[in-house]
């Protein structure tokens, strides 16, 4: 069954700036990574928390924009910026050290509600589905939403247990260059067409029982980690 676009109200986006300011991050070393970043951030009962995971190799203002849109449109109390030790779908050869990616993430994550963390290193989980299951088990009274950029949807069905991910927490898909319309053809969008929530209801997505997902339109940054590593700054693909 084809997935039809949902009507959206663009007025909430008028208060979202396309440029997200930098903040000066701490002096991150291997020692204080162990001390400060390998535990799950503290959260209170009843909080609404976004989970934004990635290799962030390197992190950039496009990632910060996704985080800021998610905070505003979803009404999040916190957003956990989860720097993964590795990515099963990507080569480790070009992966910067974890401490470096954490330090850069702290620099670009401007909002104090963003909690940069690398707790997956401690869990020893290689796949998102396993990580989310552990997060859910340890925080039964917190309302989580999985955050992902729309450019990831085309390969989401290649993730291990991807349908289990969709059934663990509601998902918010944030618009990215080149994905505004193409996301409709993704296997995830077609498989879970029945579970799509109008983006006008994004602030109550946390109340929905998974599977539930929404696509959030908004300002888009063409910045790409791959392009930055290759010496450019923009890419339509990432």
Region locations from a protein language model:
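Nucleotidyltransferase catalytic core that binds NTPs
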Residues: 2-238
């Amino acid at each position: 069954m084809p997935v039809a676009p949902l009507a959206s109200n663009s007025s909430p986006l008028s208060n979202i700036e396309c440029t997200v300011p930098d903040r000066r991050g701490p002096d991150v070393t291997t020692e204080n990574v162990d001390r400060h970043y390998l535990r799950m951030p503290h959260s209170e009962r009843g909080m609404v928390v976004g989970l934004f995971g990635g290799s962030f190799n390197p992190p950039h203002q496009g990632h910060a924009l996704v985080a800021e849109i998610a905070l505003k449109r979803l009404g999040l109390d916190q957003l956990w910026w989860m720097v993964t030790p590795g990515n099963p779908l990507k080569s480790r050869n070009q992966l910067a050290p974890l401490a470096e990616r954490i330090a850069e993430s702290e620099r670009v994550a401007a909002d104090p509600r963003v909690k940069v963390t690398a707790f997956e290193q401690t869990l020893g989980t290689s796949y998102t589905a396993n990580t989310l299951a552990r997060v859910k088990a340890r925080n039964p009274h917190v309302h989580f939403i999985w955050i992902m950029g729309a450019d990831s949807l085309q390969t989401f069905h290649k993730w291990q247990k991807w349908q289990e991910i969709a059934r663990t927490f509601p998902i918010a898909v944030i618009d990215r260059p080149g994905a505004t319309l193409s996301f409709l053809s993704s296997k995830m969008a077609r498989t879970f067409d029945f579970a799509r929530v109008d983006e006008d209801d994004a602030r109550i997505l946390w109340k929905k029982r998974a599977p539930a997902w929404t696509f959030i339109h908004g300002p888009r940054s063409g910045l790409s980690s791959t392009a930055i590593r290759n010496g450019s700054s923009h890419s339509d693909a990432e």
